[in-house]
Amino acid sequence: MSCFCSVQEEFYCEVLLLDESKLILTTQQQGIKKSTRGSVVLDYVFSHVNLAETEYFGVRYCDRSHQTFWLDPSKTLAEHKDLIATGPPYTLYFGVKFYAEDPGKLKEEITRYQFFLQVKQDVLQGRLPCAFNISAQLAALAIQSELGDYDPYKHTAGYVSEYRFVPDQKEDLEDSIEQIHKTLLGQVPAEAENNYLAIAKTLEMYGVDLHPVFGEKQAEYFLGLTPVGVVVYKNKTQVGKYFWPRITKVYFKETQFELRVLGRDCNETSFFFDAASKTACKNLWKCCVEHHTFFRMPENESNSLTRKLSKFSSLGSKHRYSGKTAMQIGRESTETLPRADLQVIRTRSKTYPKRSTQPAGRNNGGQAVTKMENTSEGQPKTSALTPVKSPRVKAESASVQQEKPSAPWEEDAPQSGLYNSASERNKSPKFPKAHRRSPSGGSENEPRHRRGQTADDAQANKQHRRRSRSRGNTSSGSESENSNREHRKKRNRSRQSNEMVDSAPQWEVVLRRQKEKTPNDPNQRRSRHRSRSRSPDVQAKEQLWKHIQKELVDPSGLSEEQLKEIPYKKVETQGDPIKIRHSHSPRSFGSTGAPTARTERGLCCPKSTLALIWFLLWL
């Protein structure tokens, strides 16, 4: 029993960090089990990243419906039902939970560096939209932080195209980034990152945690939780903004979410929204309570307001934010922070093939053109032009994009991490993905003649299938097809010639063969099914055939009375009585539902049964 419990408690998890590296948490290495609380997992992640200002960060996960949830430090991993249902393996995503109003006031450089990585990811994935000139400034500062000062010998033409900063990055933007990068001489990485955050914090969508909801007449809205309050978006336009001091009540019941706001005339106004599910509505309420507590409440009022907000929820749903608030963090003494011996280790960003300046790929019919370029490290790098998509593929991709719900940001960039597809998130070195063979394509071990066919073979198979269908009884049921079929039947009947022959010798041969047959005759063909039309009494047949007149009679010399009367003879046979068995199968029931009787094979005719045989004496 203990072994069975240990298998259930085994836990394997991958934590994706902001620098695109992974932290593996397992039962064997860190001793993390399903009964471990979320605070232990957070401590391992914070220790690995070397964070001291941990209140701004958290770990989230996705359920099977791609709904995101923050890991609750007070609950065990097993209590996160949506997380357990996705694995193993389990995937967590480290990121910023509460965006600081002024990231420049963060005390440690490592904290600002993690904020820089998070905001840069938001811009790349389209969650933080910005204008062309702002995008160029932010990207130039990111290049300065990673590559340092511009060097014409190291940074050759097109070096900016090796990095990705915005969705659908164009060549003109890369040229602007290169020009701005030349003007940033002397800025060290920490200074460039601070300038990056100083520009990003002024953007409208900075730090907005969006939740899709429905308003009146099922209109699509987005509720955004920000450091200053709640914003409402409709059709990518801000239609409302409510500051945290004005929000007096947050309530949810089933899928309905209520936001009560105090107006300037001291009158309260309630705004109602509908979420997609009860789980999504509860998650919106929890995030709203945590944001309200973290950014709004002083130290002595945070716990009381959290308890007050928890009473406004539905029955049985109580949630309390137990961490420090932004005001508490600001009032703490700065004696321990920043740490004197702290060293920030920055990782290189992911690079891509350099953009080709020669439009040679356009003259090759959309075929990929590969070029070799020398990098600064002296190793050759391969760059390939993207093949041209067919109009059908473009139409399908456009239809898929139209099915996505509209949001205040664009999602055209290749997403990674938390915003990947479910198939990409579940990849793991410990749990490799099983390879399935496509039913339409043959495997490598399959014979070649089964996998591939020439054009002649395909045409022959097609003709063979056409002939098979013509021999079958399948038809479309159209009137023209039925008329053609009737016409063919009449034509075939007209070709046949009916000729009268003497059948007496044929019948004698048949009777002689039946007498010669024995039960053990191997040449006798046996049927697996019972024949209902076969008579088992051979002796009765012989007696009847003796009285049958086989010669043809000429009716020309008969009178009218003789023609009207048909002569017949009475023949009596003897045999065992018939055994009747009632069948209750559905097929044997008539319209009234009463079972019908049937005669079994091998039984004789009843005694004194009159067999009335009528034979025509003329044709």
UniProtKB/Swiss-Prot annotation:
Residues 11-299 form the FERM domain. Transmembrane segments: none annotated. GO terms for cellular component: cytoplasm; cytoskeleton. The keyword Phosphoprotein does not apply. This is Band 4.1-like protein 4. GO terms for biological process: actomyosin structure organization. GO terms for molecular function: calmodulin binding. In adults, it is found in the ovary, eye, heart and brain, but not in gut or skeletal muscle. Keywords: Calmodulin-binding, Cytoplasm, Cytoskeleton. It comes from Danio rerio. Residues 471-481 have a biased composition (Low complexity).
